[in-house]
Amino acid sequence: MSARQPQNNNQQNNNSILQALQQVQQQNRPIVANIARIDPYMANMAYKMYNEIDVSINESVSTIDITNKMLRIAKGMIRSIEQGHAKMSATPFTLKESFKSLVMELLDVAYTDINTFMTQKYLELQENLTNNDLKKIHELNKTVMEYGLIYINAIHFVLLDTQGFLNEKLPTQLISPVDSARLLGHFHLKHKT
């Protein structure tokens, strides 16, 4: 009896993963499909993180709330890996590389989503301004950028907190200081362009 329970749990997990991946495909998240080939469970967590970003931006959720929600998802992912529920043939290298891919894509998607949201909001608000009111347009642009930076900072916190949690819980360090600097450097570079 007890030997069959994990199979039932895995079947339920697989069903939810398939549903999540279908939603991901509809939302054009190609990296999740690549991660799914390594570990479907991690792909499902990636989808949940993406969804937290989208929902939080649209509902103006606070930085602390989005950070805590995403960190809880990451911790749940690691607990599942530790307990053997995740479908990971977990060599440290594979786990490290898949997590790095996930974090990199999270940053890229977060930046794209934030940038799209800010652009839409800017255009909506700009419609109410006259073409000659350059000062108001400048102030509006500054406000929208500051709004977006709240979420960019939230993603930074998630990256750093999750990295610390993973390095503490798993026997091998997933992301070295050099890797971390490269990830954040890549994100800053994208943000400036």
Curated annotation (Swiss-Prot):
Ranked from the top, the taxonomy reads: Viruses, Viruses incertae sedis, Bicaudaviridae, Bicaudavirus
Q: Which organism is it from?
A: Acidianus two-tailed virus (ATV)
Its domain of life? Viruses
Q: What name appears for this protein in its UniProt entry? A: Uncharacterized protein ORF193
